[in-house]
Amino acid sequence: MAYSTREILLALCIRDSRVHGNGTLHPVLELAARETPLRLSPEDTVVLRYHVLLEEIIERNSETFTETWNRFITHTEHVDLDFNSVFLEIFHRGDPSLGRALAWMAWCMHACRTLCCNQSTPYYVVDLSVRGMLEASEGLDGWIHQQGGWSTLIEDNIPGSRRFSWTLFLAGLTLSLLVICSYLFISRGRH
């Protein structure tokens, strides 16, 4: 079955919230799940495999993720629209790659985790952020469909395999592009 990027990312954020949260799902994620009924469960094999892959990317690049997110959230004025702006900076040539897609998904999952686990984050900031990342991510759907869908892409990346290692490596390199794009976006927005 072909899943949209929105469905995959939302299921990943819900899964991640259950793993790293305080046992309850953030109300914004509950609302998003009601607005976009999921055709796959956060416990689905596809979601679990992507979660492992994205966790590895986040763990290997934790300082970069934290620094980039802090810079983004500190300098953004319209968080929902700004997710789309960063997405457009990363994929502006219309030439996505698996590394870019995974770096983007990992950054979004990390952002969602950071926002949902921080009790002092205002509801509206979490709401606008989750909406912004889900909407921006829909821009990957055409490319993902051409690659055979999210399910096909993860089947080729089994943890421990050579391809899995290369995927992690390429996603790490692509993360630097994410950092550069977010800095460019932020500095452009300040002038």
From Swiss-Prot:
UniProt motif BH2: location: 142-157
GO biological process: negative regulation of release of cytochrome c from mitochondria; symbiont-mediated suppression of host apoptosis; symbiont-mediated suppression of host autophagy
Membrane topology of the entry: Single-pass membrane protein
Record's keyword terms, sorted: Apoptosis, Early protein, Glycoprotein, Host membrane, Host mitochondrion, Host-virus interaction, Inhibition of host apoptosis by viral BCL2-like protein, Inhibition of host autophagy by virus, Membrane, Modulation of host cell apoptosis by virus, Transmembrane, Transmembrane helix
Function text: Prevents premature death of the host cell during virus production, which would otherwise reduce the amount of progeny virus. Acts as a host B-cell leukemia/lymphoma 2 (Bcl-2) homolog, and interacts with pro-apoptotic proteins to prevent mitochondria permeabilization, release of cytochrome c and subsequent apoptosis of the host cell. In addition, plays a role in the inhibiton of host BECN1-mediated starvation-induced autophagy without affecting basal levels of autophagy.
The protein's assembly and partners: Interacts with isoform 1 of host VRK2; this interaction is involved in protecting cells from apoptosis. Interacts with host PRA1; this interaction seems to modulate BHRF1 anti-apoptotic activity. Interacts with host BCL2L11. Interacts with host BAD and BBC3. Interacts with BALF1; BALF1 acting as a negative regulator of the survival function of BHRF1. Interacts with host BECN1.
Chain ranges passing through the membrane: 166-186
Keyword Membrane applies: yes
Family in the record: Belongs to the Bcl-2 family.
More info: EA-R is part of the restricted EA-complex.
Chief localisation class: host cell
Residue positions with a glycan: N22, N118
A family per Pfam: Bcl-2
Segments carrying motif BH1: 89-109
One GO cellular component, as annotated: membrane
Residue ranges, annotated region (Interaction with host VRK2): 1-18, 89-142
SUPFAM superfamilies per the UniProt record, alphabetical: Bcl-2 inhibitors of programmed cell death (SSF56854)
Subcellular location: Host membrane; Host mitochondrion
UniProt keyword Iron-sulfur present: no
Name recorded for this polypeptide: Apoptosis regulator BHRF1
